Every structure is written in C-alpha cells, then in structure tokens.
Design a protein with these regions (language model features):
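Class I S-adenosyl-L-methionine-dependent methyltransferase catalytic core
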Residues: 1-187
Length: 187
C-alpha cells in the first residue's frame, strides 16, 4: 500500500507483520463456516483467534514465529487451519497449508490478494484443494497490534476478506459479504 493511502505513514511495519485479528472478525467467520476436527493457528501472536475458537468450543493447537514455531518449517499434518498470516508471506503460507491440511483452510487476507498472474497460476488454479468461498467485509477494518475486548475496531482503508479453501469442494468459488458495520467504532 502506498504511503498516500496508509494511516501508518510514519511508522515502521510491525515485526513479522504482527496485526491482531479483532475478535468480531473471527466470530463472523465461525458464524458462517463450520470446521470438523482440530484447528491449527500457526500465527497465534497474542491469541486473539484462539480466544474465539475457545468461545465456540473448538479444539485447537497453535504456533507462532515469536516462540520458535515457524509454520513454514512445520511439517505436521492438521485437520484445519485458521489464521491471519504475515501478508508478505501469504502465498508461501497458503501453499504450505495446502500440503499439510486435510480439510479446510481459512485465511484473513487483503481482498487485493486476488489479483496477480503468479498467484493465479500457483494458488487459484488448484483443483485438489480449491478456493471455496470469499467472505468480504463490507466496512474496511483497521487492523493494529492492539485489540479491544469488545471486538470493535476503527475503520481503515484496506478491504479484508476471509478466504476459505476446502479440499472436498467441487466447482467455482463464491463470494459473500459480511456486514461488519456494528463492529466499527463510531466517532
């Protein structure tokens, strides 16, 4: 994102692209998608996604690069993965997850991740572990390294979506929208 479009123009990018996932964003995902089996969160940071998985009574395990558990060096098999990966490594995370996941993958990514010929060839054309659904947030969430207990967040300038891959999915991916207006902090 260019400096003219970012609200973070004078700050360095957080180490390891650390942006927490507001609780409400994960709740929106889990209200729409069901996961069978255990969930692995490879970028757990301070546990924001894990807190919501706990609320929804999912069994999970986690890892994070900050405590020596680099997902790209992890070759364990998982039933499902839910994560907000470092966007600078998104393609690598997606490809690695597809090799080590048996059921579903959900990743929170900027919507503009959809474009690009290399991603098209390496990620989107895959029919063995295809993209099933994209849940686009109607309002632009502002992700930061701090989150509020109530799950609310400011409005930013980047469009985010939950991208869902499902090994058993047949056919084209579909798009749905998440009305997150109630999650935006009113000024």
């Amino acid at each position: 994102m260019g400096k003219n479009f970012s609200l973070n123009t004078n700050k360095a990018r957080p180490k390891n692209d650390f942006y927490q996932t507001p609780y409400s964003m994960t709740r929106h995902l889990l209200d729409r998608e069901k996961f069978e089996g255990k969930i692995f969160e490879p970028c757990c940071g301070e546990g924001a996604i894990l807190k919501v998985l706990d609320e929804y009574n999912y069994e999970y395990s986690c890892g994070d690069i900050t405590f020596a558990s680099n997902f790209l060096e992890n070759f364990s098999q998982h039933d499902n993965i839910i994560t907000n990966p470092p966007y600078s490594l998104a393609k690598e995370f997606i490809l690695h997850a597809k090799e080590h996941t048996s059921k579903k993958i959900a990743m929170l990514l900027p919507l503009n991740y959809l474009h690009g010929i290399q991603r098209y060839r390496e990620v989107w054309l895959d029919t063995e572990f295809p993209l099933k659904k994209i849940y686009v947030f109607c309002r632009y969430p502002m992700l930061s390294n701090e989150i509020r207990e109530d799950g609310k967040y400011g409005s930013g300038m980047m469009v985010y979506a939950w991208f869902i891959w499902d090994r058993d999915h047949k056919g084209s991916a579909t798009i749905d929208w998440i009305d997150n207006s109630d999650d935006i902090i009113k000024k």
